[in-house]
């Protein structure tokens, strides 16, 4: 959260923006964004995390002979469970982007339904965030997908133009 907020012309509007941002950050903790444990068994999908992590580590060892056998233990103890999870994806950045967007959308939905006192300001900040969004049709396919997901979580997908090539 920034030390100084000068996003809007009035002190009151800037304070509302601050409350929305602070509420969203607190929602990460309150609604469990960081409760994920890599080694906890999946109860919905086939659990392939450990297999994928081992496969990735073996690929790294084949490509780099200088990797020591104890590196896996050091890595596991020095990174968070979330980092460990995203490291198993071939396109880590895309996986992290999709997770962040969907998780932020989940949090926004919870905040809007459980904190009615901030709802008007929250929706206003969401609406304002649409002003500087890029045009989807001007983006490459992967970026267009990400932008579409952002708009969906801001509940603005209905008026979003999707190029036919995507």
Regions found by a protein language model. Name each.
Residues 1-166:
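Short, functionally important secondary-structure microenvironments
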């Amino acid at each position: 959260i920034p030390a100084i907020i000068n996003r809007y012309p009035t002190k009151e509007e800037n304070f509302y923006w601050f409350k929305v941002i602070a509420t969203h950050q607190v929602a990460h903790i309150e609604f469990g964004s960081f409760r994920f444990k890599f080694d906890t068994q999946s109860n919905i999908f086939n659990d392939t995390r450990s297999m994928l992590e081992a496969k990735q580590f073996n690929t790294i060892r084949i490509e780099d002979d200088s990797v020591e056998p104890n590196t896996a233990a050091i890595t596991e103890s020095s990174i968070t469970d979330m980092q460990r999870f995203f490291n198993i994806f071939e396109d880590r950045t895309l996986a992290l982007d999709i997770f962040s967007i969907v998780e932020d959308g989940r949090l926004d939905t919870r905040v809007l339904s459980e904190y009615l006192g901030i709802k008007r300001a929250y929706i206003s900040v969401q609406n304002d965030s649409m002003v500087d969004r890029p045009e989807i049709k001007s983006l490459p396919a992967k970026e267009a997908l990400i932008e579409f997901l952002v708009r969906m979580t801001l509940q603005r997908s209905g008026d979003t133009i999707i190029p036919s090539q995507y």
